[in-house]
Design a protein with these regions (language model features):
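N-terminal beta-strand motif that seeds the catalytic metal site of vicinal oxygen chelate
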Residues: 1-17, 73-76, 123-136
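Vicinal oxygen chelate
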Residues: 2-11, 29-32, 42-47, 51-54, 62-136, ...
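Core segments of cupin and vicinal oxygen chelate
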Residues: 7-53
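Flexible, glycine-rich phosphate/dinucleotide-binding loops
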Residues: 35-37, 50, 64-65, 123-126
């Protein structure tokens, strides 16, 4: 058995592609418009992955629908070569870092559809670095 893809439902293709491609750095590798089913599937891959497995499938239903109660997903996880650089790039592009990488290992952000993305440092944690360092409060 091998991992193929993770599917998340999105409400706005443009906002989602801006987030996942322009801000996070994924690339679109395939798109399927299904007129009979009234939906579009967009498959995205990480920069250095093959284009058949480990994909993110964005599902856009043409008829408007709000996704509540976990109907759109939990979280996605990606490993990166430098968590600080990735978080800085995201922040500079207007993305809120919900859980900063203070430990040099893990961070969380959210997509425009509220999907949580876990960003993990590849290999060992990086040493603490500004502006992400933990501040000690002296009383």
């Amino acid at each position: 058995m091998k991992y193929l893809h993770t599917m998340v439902r999105v409400e706005n293709i443009e906002k989602s592609l801006d987030f996942y491609c322009n801000k996070l750095g994924l690339k679109e590798v395939r798109r399927v418009d299904n007129e009979k089913g009234r939906f579009t599937l967009i498959f995205l891959a990480a920069e250095n992955s093959d284009e058949k497995t480990g994909l993110l499938e964005l599902t856009y239903n043409w008829d408007p629908e709000k996704y509540t109660g976990g109907r759109n997903f939990g979280h996605l996880a990606y490993s990166v070569k430098n968590i600080y650089e990735v978080c800085e790039k995201l922040m500079n592009n207007g993305v809120t870092i919900n859980r900063p990488p203070r430990d040099g290992h893990m961070a969380f952000v959210r997509s425009p559809d509220g999907i949580s993305l876990e960003i993990l440092q590849e290999g060992k944690s990086l040493p603490e670095q500004e502006p992400w360092k933990l501040s000690l409060i002296h009383i």
